[in-house]
């Protein structure tokens, strides 16, 4: 299928390559920025699949339909690559944000406007509510009265609103208008979960000016061929983004998947080295892959592989490292004991 025309693609207008941005709609395919983003009477609208207090992030998540990547392992493919949801204007997003602010019970500083820092206050197990007892892993920060039940489980409500799911930051207008309204009318931090592909210098400046506070950057792979195979797109400028984001004063966290036989310790160490150049205290999560979408023939990592990756990343100089999706690779008591004895306390 032909590439988007320059007149319709914001990236091509800036001399850049378009993303892998086609989505299914009515049995056909269309550009995500045309099928899930629109402008009527000068106002932007975005197709939103759902909005709710998410766990374990413990913030208001806005799940977007339509994406400029075609990730083979995407666990959100059924709405990120398929047109799904209802249209929201920036004013509609503000209305949701204002309503959410009324239930916020954990006020974080701007530097903690991330998913990574959610674990500092609550592990979302619900034990203090269901069993009236805190587990040994509890941070012991919050009283039980602060723990709320949401569609995804127990936890607090932090003062953050996040755009997640499909990524169309290559067309920043909607995010810009939403951020301006949210910052003007609430005390919430604005976080964008992103693959980074659309975040060239101009778009970063526009988002900074609008009041966006933080980014959760998924770096899929270091090797350009692996990244292209995984996503359909280049990672050339994505690897430069951590430094560009830090330079502009954004709060930042980075996440990468450990995918056996594809993105393993060597790849993750190279990503960590690049992050360390931007700042050793950037929070970094090693997330265990599980088979999904077009990668169901791939296996999950072992606990030994994850531990090896953890120490490799640590050797690169990063100070804030966490392991995610523990249940994927540490399913037995033996695996859990091995993990606890081989990584630092609080790292998962």
Task: State what each model feature region is.
Residues 1-19, 246, 258-348:
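Auxiliary Fe-S-binding modules of radical SAM enzymes
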Residues 139-300:
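Conserved AdoMet/S-adenosylmethionine-binding subsite of the radical SAM
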Residues 97-101, 182, 275, 313:
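Hydrophobic, Leu/Ile/Phe/Ala-enriched alpha-helical segments that form helix-helix packing faces
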Residues 81-84, 193, 254-255, 323-324:
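Residue-level detector of family-conserved "landmark" positions at structurally sensitive sites
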Residues 1-147, 154, 334-337, 343-348:
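N-terminal [4Fe-4S]-dependent radical SAM core
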């Amino acid at each position: 299928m032909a590439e988007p025309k320059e007149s319709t693609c914001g990236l091509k207008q800036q001399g850049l390559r378009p993303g892998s941005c086609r989505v299914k709609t009515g049995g056909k395919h269309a550009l995500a920025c045309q099928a899930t983003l629109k402008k009527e009477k000068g106002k932007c609208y975005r197709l939103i699949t759902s909005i709710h207090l998410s766990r374990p992030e413990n913030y208001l998540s806005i799940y977007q339909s339509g994406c400029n990547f075609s990730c083979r392992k995407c666990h959100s493919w059924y709405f990120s690559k398929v047109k799904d949801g209802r249209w929201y204007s920036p004013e509609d997003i503000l209305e949701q944000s204002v309503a959410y602010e009324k239930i916020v019970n954990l006020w974080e500083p701007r530097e903690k406007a991330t998913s990574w820092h959610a674990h500092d206050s609550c592990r979302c197990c619900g034990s203090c509510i269901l069993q009236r007892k805190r587990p040994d892993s509890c941070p012991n920060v919050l009283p039980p009265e602060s723990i709320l039940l949401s569609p995804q489980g127990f936890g607090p409500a932090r003062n953050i609103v996040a755009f997640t799911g499909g990524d169309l930051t290559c067309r920043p207008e909607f995010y810009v208008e939403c951020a301006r309204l949210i910052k003007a009318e609430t005390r919430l931090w604005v976080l964008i979960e992103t693959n980074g592909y659309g975040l060239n210098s101009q778009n970063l400046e526009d988002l900074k000016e609008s009041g966006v506070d933080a980014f959760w950057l998924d770096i899929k792979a270091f090797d350009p061929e692996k990244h292209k195979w995984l996503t359909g797109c280049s990672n050339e400028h994505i690897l430069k983004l951590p430094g560009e984001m830090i330079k502009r004063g954004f709060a930042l966290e980075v996440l990468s998947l450990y995918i056996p036989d594809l993105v393993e310790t060597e790849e993750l160490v190279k990503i960590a080295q690049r992050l360390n150049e931007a700042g050793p205290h950037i929070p970094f999560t090693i997330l265990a892959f599980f088979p999904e979408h077009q990668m169901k023939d791939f296996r999950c990592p072992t606990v030994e592989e994850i531990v090896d990756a953890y120490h490799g990343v640590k050797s690169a100089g990063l100070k804030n490292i966490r392991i995610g999706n523990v249940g994927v690779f540490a399913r037995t008591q033996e695996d859990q004991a091995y993990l606890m004895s081989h990584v630092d306390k609080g790292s998962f």
